[in-house]
Amino acid sequence: RMGMPGLMDILKQIADMWENNRQKILSAGDEITNTIQPRQELNAPVNTVNTETLRKGYGQLKKSFDAKWGGFGAAPKFPTPHHLTFLLRWGKRSAEPFALKMVKKTLTAMRRGGIFDQIGFGFHRYSVDAKWLVPHFEKMLYDQALLAIAYIEAYQATKEKKFAVTAQEIFTYVLRDMTDPNGGFYSAEDADSEGREGGFYVWKRKEIMDHLGEKEGDLFCRFYGISDKGNFEEGFSIPCISLSLEDFAKQEGMEPGKLEKDLMNSRRRIFVLRGKRIHPLKDDKILTAWNGLMIAALSKGYQAMGDKKYADAAVAAADFILAKLRGRDGRLFRRFRHGDVAYPGYLDDYAFLVWGLIELYEATFEVSYLEEAVALNKAMIDIFWDKKGGGLYFTGKGNETLITVSKDAYDGALPSGNSVAALNFLRLGRMTGNVDLEKRAEQLIRSFSGDINVFPMGYTHLLSAVDFIAGPAQEIVIAGDPAHKATKSMIRAVQEKFLPNKVVLLYNDGPEGKRLEALSPFVK
């Protein structure tokens, strides 16, 4: 057609070339493979990754920070919560107030923007504009988990309640809409509804007014920026907040508590109305890696805020993954859907789940979760570790054979498996007294040190591991009966604080204590 060969003609040519020029094709394949392989590491390793690297990473983030709207760089804007969690650590280390200012500005702006579902909660994937107003409306499980962690740590660092409330809202969404009855968490919700991007989430002012009435509807629309003109396509409005509750209450001459209660009641009524729409398609596969992130987030949520339903949900998910997505040989699978388990696990499945199990141990002090973390961490090293150059490959024994194997530490929309693994090594090393794990973390970081030192802003989760190594780190052993009031008070005192470079063990007499001794002999 139009002078171009058809598919059948191309297939015949391929068959002919394979029959008559096989060696030439194989040689070309080898040449391509050899060309690709060296690009896996663009900068040779150097010996130094230290607090100066952290300082450089902070400087790059500061330079790219959007002082007006928060976040980093120009549109489209992704949340990149590991930038924020690194800045919290750097702010604590350096006492640099602007680090915390960037975190607070970004978290506040995102919560007020259209990137956050103001009616049903949870974050959309990214913003197409600089001011967080118009999102790509898809919702991803990993964004909910990583952003919840950022808001929780910001709450621990500042004690500003609004950050805790946002984390609670994220969990409300996940536990309501993204949780399988058996305990795992679903992957995503689509952007489209009824054939229109964002159709489920946007509103006409008349629709709100007809449902809430003149006075209540007008107040709701003005607070959430819903107008006749609209701020989106075709006169629709994406709910967003331009003034804080306190400033809006002052403008309206209202008591903030009364305004908050009225808006909450109106929002609930609109949420019920929205429920009559056709819901976006749910991607109901359960991924080991992303479930690991949500287990970590819920566990940290319980530690910081003390709501037992978060710990219960994390336990249910961890038990589900360990029961359904692990083979008899102890290796993980990647995906579960409607009873079907598929694909050997990749690096991030192991690294992210180990992270979740470490946090779950520190939330519940159930030794079994620390045992599982240690075992899966060992399996991960056996399967993915690069014995020659250090670091972990994304694929390993049992995964599909590729023409090139990827080994990367870049922290993009998600932190990399290597970055998460490095911090896991450090924490498990301190929790169990295994110095070799800490050395392995240093070796991993050194293997990527050339790239890290060139562009540390691209490795902010790995920088959190560097921050841990730089110290000081706290190894806290609480001895006592977990049911005893004094023990509970000590646990709460530790968990409420922002202590990013800590590990916590609970030791008591009895079977649990003996199991902990087997993992961590120094607690005796």
List PLM regions with ranges.
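Catalytic nucleophile-loop/oxyanion-hole region of alpha/beta-hydrolase
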Residues: 163, 310, 341-344
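Glycine/proline-rich, flexible active-site/cofactor-binding loop segments
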Residues: 84, 103-106, 311-314, 318-321
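Tandem alpha-helical RNA-recognition repeat domains
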Residues: 88, 92, 152, 156, ...
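Glycine-rich, acidic and aromatic/proline-enriched surface loops and short helix-turn segments
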Residues: 109-116, 316-324
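Replace the tail clause
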Residues: 1-297, 301-305, 336, 445-524
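Long, polar/charge-rich, low-hydrophobicity segments
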Residues: 176-179, 323, 328-352, 356-517
